[in-house]
Amino acid sequence: MQMGDHQMMGNQRYYRTYVQKVMPAQAGGAVSQNATYVQTAGIRTVHHDGNGQQRIVQLPPGVRQIQQNGVGPAYVRQVPGGQPMQVNFGHPGTIAGRNVAVGVQMRPVQGHNVQQGYQRQQVANQIQQQNRAVFMAQNQQGQQQISYAQAQHRQQQQNQQQHHQQPQHFNHPSQQNQMIMQHRQPQMHHNQQHQMVQPQMTRHQMAQHHAQQPHPQIYVPRDMNLAVPLREPSPEPIPVKIEVPDVPPEGTSAANEEPMPDDGDIDIQIRNVVCNYTLPLHIDLRKLAMNTHNVTYEREKGVMMKQKRSPGCYIKVYSSGKVYIVGCRSEADCKRAARSIARHVQRVMGKTKERVSIRNYRVNNVLATCRLPFGIKIEEVAAKYPSESTYEPELSVGLVWRSVTPKATLRIHTTGSITVTGAQSEADVLEVLSKIYPIVLEFRCLERAKGNVAAQKKRKRKAPVNRGPPIKRERFDDSNYRNSGVINNQVYFSDEDEDLYDELDLEE
């Protein structure tokens, strides 16, 4: 902390502008309880003339002769309270731990020093900077040794003569600075007095005091640019032209797209054929079931069910003579199964000598599937043909197409798979697929085409779980009654003895 104090000597006031930290005396010591300061720099002298004006002169730095254990702001305490003061006059020494000059005695401003009080601050600054250099230069030239005070007095006289000879130009920057300092001097004097009067503040009070002081504003000229780039500007990127292929909108059809390669004829597979007919006789189902193998007879429903291996199908026979055949893979297999079961009924019922004919033979349903070599945009098909098609993605993944002539129902999937149901014959299946092919070809899509990749993949059977050898369990017979079990509604265990409860009196 730097502070300043002053001492009045006659009509002159001494200022110590640069002081060190305040060192309060300790209680119980030889030094009285007062705040003292240590001088470390120059002294400024203020002189009052007859007109009431103040003149300031800056004296060179030096060491003032002080008294030991003095009291008041004019004296300096260099050691803690209770210890003797160090004499620093006339020999090398320190003031508050700093090296000081020796052999110089500061006197009150008298005689010619009073005249120096009327000099401008520019002369005082020159004296402060040059006095010691002149004194050392004269001694080095081998001239007569003079004291430091005499050299200082001679230098002041030379500067005074140069000052009277040179004209005063207040436009000079150095003189403008002097005028600014003279205007600021009363404010500095007020701040110094305020610091002398106030006692030592606590750390919290000092923080508040500094926070209240306004921060100095820095004036930046207009020509000065503080936005200094941290690095050199990078060159501007060169635009690169990227060619984007023309993509047709989603709403357009795929008729203008590149046609997909022809993989050959479309393979249509018949999965199921359902037919029925009637025999002109009453059939005894119990007798027929007793003379037929691989059958199931349900007397309550009045039906006999038979599973035929060649051709593979499933047959239902009613006592009224109606026969239903399900599961054949072609119409030819369905006719062959119908003739076979009719001949077997004729033999069992003893009608071999009579003519039994098949009446009302009809194919009810043909189920067929086929796979197209491209994908289909079924949402666009449903939008273009709302009367023939029905598409409900929340209910089913496929589009339902209802054909009137020939009568059939088709289920079309996005993968290109088509399922035909409700056809009356294989010819109807071929006809309805021939009609639907140009429609789905218009809405094909390449990204959904899978080709024969899915067809080439074989379904892998799940590997059986490796289990240990089967555990053979004993049969419940008379030989293992004693192990455990239930006999005559009584539960017993093999480790129980027959006379276990004989010794207990249960009536008590």
Swiss-Prot record:
Keywords: DNA-binding, Nucleus, Transcription, Transcription regulation. It is found in: Nucleus. It comes from the Eukaryota. CDD domains: TLF. One of its GO terms (cellular component) is chromatin. One of its GO terms (molecular function) is DNA binding. Disruption phenotype: RNAi-mediated knockdown causes early embryonic defects, including premature cell division of the Ea and Ep blastomeres, a failure to undergo gastrulation, and embryonic arrest. Knockdown causes severe loss of polymerase II large subunit ama-1 phosphorylation. Knockdown also causes a reduction in expression levels of several embryonic genes. GO terms for biological process: DNA-templated transcription initiation; embryo development ending in birth or egg hatching; negative regulation of transcription by RNA polymerase II; positive regulation of transcription by RNA polymerase II. Residues 145-190, 236-262, 456-479 are annotated as: Disordered. Transmembrane segments: none annotated. InterPro entries: TBP, TBP-like, TBP_dom_sf. May be a general transcription factor. Plays an essential role for RNA polymerase II/ama-1 transcription in early embryos whereby it activates a subset of RNA polymerase II promoters and facilitates the reestablishment of transcription after mitosis. Belongs to the TBP family. This is TATA box-binding protein-like 1. It comes from Caenorhabditis elegans. The gene is tlf-1.
